Amino acid sequence: MEAFNTVTAIVAPLDRANVDTDAIIPKQFLKSIKRSGFGPNLFDEWRYLDQGQPGKSNEGRPLNKDFVLNLPRYAGARILLARDNFGCGSSREHAPWALQDFGFRVIIAPSFADIFFNNCFKNGILPIVQEASVVDSLFAEVAAQPGYQLTVDLPAQRITTPSGRSIAFEVDPFRKHCLIHGLDDIGLTLQHVADIQAYESKHKGQAPWAFLD
């Protein structure tokens, strides 16, 4: 998993509440269990005017020119500004996979669905909860300033706006550690390989049936 320290990037405003995981990545794309390759179909039913199909190129598909991610001013955005209850619906981990594969590293919203919130941390995305009034002010600033960027400093737990306004945010210390060091569940386990091997060596004689080669 890519380590997270500080991100300075364009902000894309998705001004909709209750965005569910089926909107983030529609159900027909869930056949793959690889983490990569979902970005082109992120928000597929909103980005395109026809229905996408797994395994088919998006080249030539008619775009919804009014959708935020199709607007030139938000090209290359890595920070997503959202509304309440982002990531609700089914627990599919494909949703953060699609967001990460598209390029997003940060999502700022007043609230998130619990499972989606947890899955973001496991996939290198920092979900930041802010008061609705703060989110409202950021939406207004993004709308007023083309090319609007935020700097998100995870070690300092600070968001900095173009005007220099500093906004603090909370993050669980363990999750912060994992993001800064690029540790997903597998990475965390691999940090304890020596302990795991020592345990196996100690217990093989007592329960050899549990350690079949």
Swiss-Prot record:
Broad class of enzyme this protein falls into: lyase
Short name of any one Pfam family annotated for the protein: Aconitase_C
Alphabetized PANTHER family for the sequence: 3-ISOPROPYLMALATE DEHYDRATASE SMALL SUBUNIT, 3-ISOPROPYLMALATE DEHYDRATASE SMALL SUBUNIT 2-RELATED-RELATED
Alphabetized UniProt keyword annotations: Amino-acid biosynthesis, Branched-chain amino acid biosynthesis, Leucine biosynthesis, Lyase
EC number(s) reported in the record: 4.2.1.33
Metabolic or biological pathway: Amino-acid biosynthesis; L-leucine biosynthesis; L-leucine from 3-methyl-2-oxobutanoate: step 2/4
Chain's role: Catalyzes the isomerization between 2-isopropylmalate and 3-isopropylmalate, via the formation of 2-isopropylmaleate.
Cellular component annotations (GO), alphabetically ordered: 3-isopropylmalate dehydratase complex
GO molecular-function terms, A-Z: 3-isopropylmalate dehydratase activity
Family: Belongs to the LeuD family. LeuD type 1 subfamily.
Assembly, per entry: Heterodimer of LeuC and LeuD.
Catalytic activity: (2R,3S)-3-isopropylmalate = (2S)-2-isopropylmalate
HAMAP family membership: LeuD_type1
Record organism: Magnetococcus marinus (strain ATCC BAA-1437 / JCM 17883 / MC-1)
Entry protein name: 3-isopropylmalate dehydratase small subunit
InterPro entries xref list: 3-IsopropMal_deHydase_ssu (IPR004431), Aconitase/3IPM_dehydase_swvl (IPR015928), AconitaseA/IPMdHydase_ssu_swvl (IPR000573), IPMI_Swivel (IPR033940), LeuD (IPR050075)
Record GO biological process: L-leucine biosynthetic process
